[in-house]
């Protein structure tokens, strides 16, 4: 995949600034590039047993050794004392009441693990919820259209978790993903606007474990970041994945000038109202504070 975009990285201190790399003219400018190791068409299965409910009713904390956290605070961090930007006044705007409200997947249905890693997306007619290793599809009135189903029943790769669901409104398609413990990102893109129908399923192998993946929709691809060192930002060929093309690629690069407190995950910008013009760079956001980095 040949991208000629300017890769821009935005990092937040107390103010926001943008760091732009030179225009990339070929794949050789990126540290990682690979074609999907597997592509197939799959149909969701909603009549298989879900994860067993915890007999003791307890919630379990899932420890992830891949997540690197340093709980250190710098004595030289500014400002000293209170935050001068802290707002002490209540908003004058009244809160809006929910349009509709219903119970989704609960802890027992989703395996009882903590954190639950919830993700949800809404489309014109559906709401898709993912929690831990389970997902379920509802209509927009809150009626369950399917039984809860394991991620593995659709995505394969076991039920590793860290699920993400997006509705790509520009293509009227659904995007569901989880990682696998084989250093893979597994992505399903629906073939129609119906999330209960068939999906194009892609498996992308990476150089190391893609912890805490975060995705976005952009004009030239699906962008994704991961909590890992080395190549930690990627772009998937969106057009090919929507078409079910088995030659779809993912390219990756290392985010430059990133000082972290041990947590590498960055948030990619996603298009909301309209798709940016072709050639518009994507922006990656990272909150950086001198108290820890």
Identify what each model region corresponds to:
Residues 22-293:
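C-terminal PAP-associated
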Residues 1-25:
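Bacterial Sec-dependent N-terminal signal peptides
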